[in-house]
């Protein structure tokens, strides 16, 4: 009888562990999908800005010429970065709960860090625009570049904020999975409780 009870317990734990791993794999695939979609959106925005900025810079005058010129330059760099990110992104294998948690925290921290950089871009653009008012050396270029950098920093801040919010909301599913596990210790040993 003891063998049958032990076998039944092992079977239940095995089925539960398999179900949790499948749930974890689905979670990780969704995180990858969210990131790939974000990269595609940013790449599309950048490509459109390169095309439009290049055309508009040739037709504009004054600070507007430099505004469009910087939009094309800025988004050329952004498109290069997103292209590298897309090409180097690899599908992950099966990750443990702890590995998944680490990946989730890292992606959220990345978007928060990027948001900080975006604020610095906006401040840098504001500095260039303000400097254009007091310099005699190409003030139109400083004004146009400053306005462009502020705009692009603002767009990136919006993008990074949205991506952080989406990943953060998705990460709450991982927390729910973790709540199903409870590790306890006593003087007699260590136990793992799996809530079914």
Regions found by a protein language model. Give the residues of each.
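Long, highly hydrophobic alpha-helical transmembrane signal-anchor segments
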Residues: 45-65
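Membrane-water interface of transmembrane alpha-helices
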Residues: 80-95
């Amino acid at each position: 009888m003891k063998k049958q009870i032990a076998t039944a317990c092992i079977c239940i734990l095995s089925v539960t562990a398999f179900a949790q791993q499948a749930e974890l794999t689905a979670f990780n695939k969704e995180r990858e999908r969210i990131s790939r979609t974000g990269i595609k959106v940013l790449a599309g925005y950048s490509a459109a800005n390169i095309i439009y900025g290049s055309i508009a810079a040739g037709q504009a005058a004054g600070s507007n010429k430099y505004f469009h010129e910087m939009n094309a330059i800025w988004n050329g760099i952004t498109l290069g970065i997103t292209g590298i990110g897309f090409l180097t992104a690899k599908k992950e294998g099966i990750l443990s709960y702890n590995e998944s948690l680490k990946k989730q925290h890292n992606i959220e921290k990345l978007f928060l860090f990027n948001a900080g950089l975006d604020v610095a871009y906006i401040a840098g653009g504001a500095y260039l625009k303000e400097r254009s008012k007091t310099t005699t050396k190409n003030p139109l270029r400083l004004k146009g570049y400053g306005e462009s950098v502020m705009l692009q920093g603002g767009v990136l801040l919006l993008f990074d904020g949205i991506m952080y919010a989406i990943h953060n909301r998705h990460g709450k599913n991982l927390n729910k999975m973790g709540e199903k596990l409870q590790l306890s210790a006593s003087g007699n040993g260590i136990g793992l409780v799996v809530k079914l």
